[in-house]
Amino acid sequence: MADQLTEEQIAEFKEAFSLFDKDGDGTITTKELGTVMRSLGQNPTEAELQDMINEVDADGNGTIDFPEFLTMMARKMKDTDSEEEIREAFRVFDKDGNGYISAAELRHVMTNLGEKLTDEEVDEMIREADIDGDGQVNYEEFVTMMTSK
């Protein structure tokens, strides 16, 4: 996981890690973790922090060493990438760029993908994703649909 990071990213994370490794012993406490991540533009909730700590703190001693920290940051960045992929997919469907996917736009993309759908099938797909009932799919609805699997 951490091997997918660039040298620049690793250097950036090392710098941030060092800032919070007060006594220079190569570990940071779980309490310091949230501060480190926020300094890098991440915004984890308390529950997310606890989950991340539990995942990487193998010996359960409440501290995290740098390799563990790198693994965790790489995971967090992977999540961010998938958000960008969803945004990109939405742009593909939203042909006219008005912020909504209409039945016609959905039909067009599905046809290009080799999916020959009836009008009823297309309308049903829109209905399933259309939370506010306006007959089209906005970005928030699209994200909900894409992440609810």
UniProtKB/Swiss-Prot annotation:
Record-listed Ca(2+) 4 binding positions: 130, 132, 134, 136, 141
Q: Which residues bind Ca(2+) 2?
A: 57, 59, 61, 63, 68
Q: Which residues carry this modification: N6,N6,N6-trimethyllysine?
A: 116
For whether the record's keyword set contains RNA-binding, the answer is no
Q: Which SMART domains match?
A: EFh
Q: Which domain of life is it from?
A: Eukaryota
Cite the InterPro entries for this sequence: CALM/Myosin/TropC-like (IPR050230), EF-hand-dom_pair (IPR011992), EF_Hand_1_Ca_BS (IPR018247), EF_hand_dom (IPR002048)
> The EF-hand domain covers which part of the protein?
8-43, 44-79, 81-116, 117-149
- What GO annotations for molecular function exist for this entry? calcium ion binding
Q: Which UniProt keywords apply?
A: Acetylation, Calcium, Metal-binding, Methylation, Repeat
> Where does the record place the modification N-acetylalanine?
2
State where Ca(2+) 3 binds.
Answer: 94, 96, 98, 100, 105
Q: Name the SUPFAM superfamilies for this protein.
A: EF-hand (SSF47473)
Its Gene Ontology cellular component terms are: myosin II complex
Name the positions where Ca(2+) 1 binds.
Answer: 21, 23, 25, 27, 32
Q: Does the keyword Metal-binding apply?
A: yes
Please tell me what else the database record remarks about this protein.
This protein has four functional calcium-binding sites.
The Swiss-Prot or TrEMBL record describes its family as follows: Belongs to the calmodulin family.
* Protein role: Calmodulin mediates the control of a large number of enzymes, ion channels and other proteins by Ca(2+). Among the enzymes to be stimulated by the calmodulin-Ca(2+) complex are a number of protein kinases and phosphatases.
Question: What name does the UniProt record give this protein?
Answer: Calmodulin
Whose protein is this, by species?
Stichopus japonicus
